[in-house]
Amino acid sequence: TGAGDSPAGYEIDGTALTITDSGTYTVSDSCADGSIKVKKGTTGVTLVLDGLTLTSENTAAITCGKSSEVTILVSNGTENSLSDTEQNNDDNYPENENAENAVIKCKDGSLVTLCGDGELTITANGKNGIKSGATTDEDGEASLTIRDLTLNIDAPVNDAINAEQLLNVESGTLTIDAADDAIHCDLVLNIGADGTDGPTIDITNCCEGLEGAELNVCSGDITINASDDCLNAANSDLTDYDFTMTISGGTIDAYTSGGDGFDSNGELAITGGTVVVWTANTADNEPLDADGTITTATTPVADLTAITVSGGTVLAAGGSSGMGMNLEAAQPCVIYGSTGFGGMPGSTQSSLIAADENFTIEDADGNAVYSGTARCGANFILFSSADVVADSAYTLKAGDSSTEGTAQSGTVSTGMGMGGGFPGGRQKPDGELPEGFDGQMPNGEKSELPDGEVPEMPSGERPTPPSGQGSPTDGNAPAGDSTSDTTPTA
């Protein structure tokens, strides 16, 4: 109920409901083609979904107008479903003036909270599952907050959740299947909060998992299965921005079949939590990749591509693009393999461990400090935890093979070794060289080019390794916001 210009605080035109004043409004039952809209500038609205099944053919199922303040509450113990059709996409249907490109559309300057103890399933046949707008001088601050509820999103066209300004995923249980990004924010994306359990997020399929110009994971239990970057701090529309990725808590179990694990176009900081990230064992994938500083300490190292470990547990494994990395290891770490040139982009590299192989990392006394099962073959493994002691030996055991490594602290360089040879290479169990190989060229001769000369690149230049840049966020440019607040016609 509500009060205002309309006696009940709302208007109904066919199957289109428009909320015009503050109040609590409960919607239930089912509708094959209808819509709910909170009028521009309307604040203090609580929209209760109480067993609602709603499909909208040519616009958003729920629209929160510009400068509105709305709480969408999913009622305890209820199952609710929102969906649209392919017509709710003005890229493919430019003649559709009512298209909002999302099942739930939150316009510029809107403050929207999606919460409750019930379950909501969103099927985005048009474009995005949820789209949140930007902060503007005219419309005010914008944000989207998700907490408590069980939220399932199927987005076979584009993003499951796409925000332009501020996106807080505080708690709840999210299951996402997306054609492009699972959870994307043009600016600030916060997952969980310090001192909380945070959300449970299961991203079963996506191109990129979590993406924001400033990406913070503070708590939660996150599983990601991606075809590109699992986590990405980037925005191709921002040319001068201090991109940051900070992992301070929670648990992340991430795998990508064709991109980087964690990819930051600026700084990458892992200061706590448990991180397990696997990348496909090809020459153009990095478990950890950053253009600025990679760090797990509170103070980044300026102008240095580095990983600094100060807390938490980190297992980063997979392939590499051939770029050497420096590490600031405040908490000691042990590295097996190398990020040195291991092959042409896309080529498969020799593995320290094979896909689905059980492995352990043991200290000098044979105590396991880590054990797991490989998601894929890996020629590079970085491990750090509070149990790792600097200058101590640790052995990676997988099947009948073992690889030795020494934990290091301070500034550590992986060097430019050859695809898995440094700092540790996979050996026969007895540490001997393969049979028939004594480490020398045949006949004891050295390999030389004709006349003993080294070829020069054109103009005397040496080849340049891949840049390590994060993947551009194609398709994630802010979508144009509809300026019309006319009630959609069903």
Where are these regions (language model features)?
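A composition-driven surface/loop motif
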Residues: 1-458, 462-490
